[in-house]
Design a protein with these regions (language model features):
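Membrane-interfacial, low-structure loops and terminal tails that flank and connect transmembrane helices
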Residues: 1, 148-164, 194-196, 204-205
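Membrane-interface coil-to-helix junctions
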Residues: 20-63, 67-72
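Start-transfer (signal-anchor) and selected internal transmembrane alpha helices
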Residues: 1-18, 166-169
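Internal/C-terminal transmembrane anchor helices
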Residues: 163-184, 207
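Transmembrane-helix motifs of polytopic, lipid-linked glycan transferases
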Residues: 78-96, 110-113, 136-144
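Membrane-interface helix caps and helix-loop-helix hairpins in membrane proteins
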Residues: 115-125
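Soluble catalytic regions of membrane-associated enzymes that act on cell-envelope
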Residues: 204-388, 403-424
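Aromatic-anchored segments of alpha-helical transmembrane domains
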Residues: 17-22, 106-117, 155, 159, ...
């Protein structure tokens, strides 16, 4: 009796472990692949994909589309991997006439699993492995029926008695399966040589690769929160990541956006060292599809829809037609009144399984000419003469937005932060006088005040007051204490509060040096 149910016990343990892995540790991978591929029930697309990438790639895209719900994607991949175990076990028994005591039949399933848990590799290999297993099982079925020697061995195996202590063999099989899984994990995190942009290569150690996977997971979770406009979650993720002390441009960029939407950009930006300088606030264009994928987010929030559209189109070129890129491009075109272009981006979504509802919503927005939550800050700006977006200098774009939309709060705060991070006090103060007068009550945000202290050291207190600005006594006292500590030179011991100031950034952190432009 125990022998009869042994394979079902092993399969159940395997299924539970796979589901836990897919829905916890590797849930972000399932989400990532679904977001970067789009299967369509559309003849031209099917023929083109089949011709360019082959049948297995097309089948994999078909499977990946169900990961729109990550739990459903996890169920499908788990079913295929457990199915591969049963097929391999049956083929083994038919061809060898032996029992699988060391769970060799689980090896294809382990290989399939580790082919589906990397964001760098499309899980096409897992589908190929399953196809090979299925083909091997069919061959074993034919041989065990028409080759007498194989048929007799298989019949003898089925008629053999159960044997003693079947629990021991079950435990041995489960232990062997665990060893295969551990070996697969070791191989997936083994040191790897990677080519760099400068033509050189670098070998990443096992520890570095494990740390890299952690960063991948956090970045993808952060991007998901941003897409969902869940600013509380994005703030929590980026704060936790910053607290780890790891330098990452994308997470600094996301953190700045989260801080703004929390109303904390000019209060808490300096809580952690801004080692990327002005690049904390944006992605400069580097002809890289990853940069293109993320660079447009800040422009969308700022209301520079045309610039966001340029970034999104570059991402479309780099990644292909995905639901995110198509829907974003459609939204941007709708807001700018480009109806025919919007229709072209909406059309592919109508042929999908899960994004048809999104296509209908975009059609509704196209009819109304408005998109919920999206504002075109440059709608009233003359298009002649034409102006090129500055893909290397966010400051120029911020100025352009403010000239067209002086009440744009995000552009105003980002401009203040940008010029301060660039060590450009002169541009910071000129921009402040033009677009951000002193409030009648209270004071400016802490980061702005800290910049004004340095401006005051250049133009004098009388001129600063004549321009309508004032600095709180608390900030002036903090600055005096900072200068006293700074004057100690190598013996300076800055407090945590002093390290979280713009003055400390200029003296110790800024990648643009200590020199201030005025």
């Amino acid at each position: 009796m125990m022998r009869k149910y042994q394979k079902y016990i092993i399969a159940s343990v395997m299924a539970i472990c796979l589901m836990i892995a897919y829905l916890t540790t590797y849930e972000y991978v399932i989400y990532f692949h679904e977001q970067h591929h789009l299967f369509r029930f559309f003849g031209p697309y099917l023929r083109e994909t089949l011709h360019e990438h082959g049948l297995f790639y097309l089948l994999t895209e078909f499977i990946v589309q169900f990961s729109y719900w990550t739990w459903l994607g996890a169920i499908i991949w788990t079913t295929l991997e457990v199915g591969a175990y049963f097929l391999t076990l049956n083929a083994w028994r038919r061809l060898t006439g032996l029992r699988d005591y060391i769970c060799v039949s689980g090896i294809p399933s382990v290989m399939m699993f580790f082919s589906t848990v990397s964001v760098d590799i499309f899980p096409e290999r897992a589908v190929k492995i399953f196809a090979c297993v299925l083909g091997g099982w069919i061959v074993s079925l034919i041989l065990s029926r028409f080759v007498p020697v194989i048929r007799r061995r298989y019949q003898a195996l089925n008629a053999a008695p159960e044997g003693k202590r079947p629990w021991i063999w079950l435990l041995i099989s489960l232990a062997a399966l665990g060893i295969y899984a551990y070996k697969g994990y070791q191989d997936s995190t083994a040191p790897k040589e990677v080519g760099l942009k400068n033509g050189r290569t670098r070998t990443f150690s096992r520890e570095e690769r494990i740390k890299q996977r952690h960063s991948e997971r956090v970045m993808i979770e952060a991007e998901r929160a941003l897409k969902q406009k869940d600013w509380d979650k994005l703030y929590e993720i980026t704060q936790d990541y910053a607290a780890e002390g790891t330098r990452n441009h994308l997470m600094s960029y996301f953190r700045a956006m989260a801080l703004y939407h929390q109303g904390k950009l000019l209060t808490n930006l300096m809580d952690y060292p801004q080692t990327f300088g002005v690049k904390t606030l944006f992605f400069p264009w580097e002809s890289d599809r990853h940069c293109a994928e993320f660079g447009g987010y800040v422009y969308e929030d700022l209301g520079a829809v045309n610039a966001a559209q340029h970034w999104e189109f570059e991402a479309l070129v780099g990644w292909g037609e995905t639901a995110t890129h198509l829907s974003n491009l459609a939204r941007y075109c709708i807001v700018q009144g480009k109806e025919e272009q919007a229709k072209k981006f909406i059309a592919p979504l109508r042929h999908t399984l899960y994004y048809r509802g999104l296509a209908r919503e975009l059609d509704r927005q196209l009819a109304s000419g408005e998109v919920d939550g999206l504002k075109n800050a440059l709608a009233d700006t003359p298009q002649d003469p034409a102006r090129w977006d500055n893909v290397l200098n966010l400051g120029a774009d911020l100025r352009y937005i403010l000239l067209s939309d002086p009440q744009n709060k995000m552009a105003r705060e980002y401009a203040a932060a940008y010029f301060l991070l660039a060590n450009n006090l002169g541009a910071f103060y000129r921009n402040l006088k033009e677009f951000w007068p002193m409030p009648e009550e209270g004071y400016m945000p802490p980061l702005v005040e800290q910049g004004l202290v340095l401006v005051q050291s250049q133009i004098g207190e009388a001129q600063l007051q004549a321009d309508g600005y004032r600095i709180s006594p608390e900030t002036e006292q903090r600055f005096r204490e900072f200068v006293l500590e700074l004057n100690k030179g190598q013996n300076a011991r800055f407090t945590p509060a002093q390290r979280q100031t713009y003055w400390y950034y200029v003296q110790r952190v800024s990648p643009h040096g200590r020199e201030l432009k005025f």
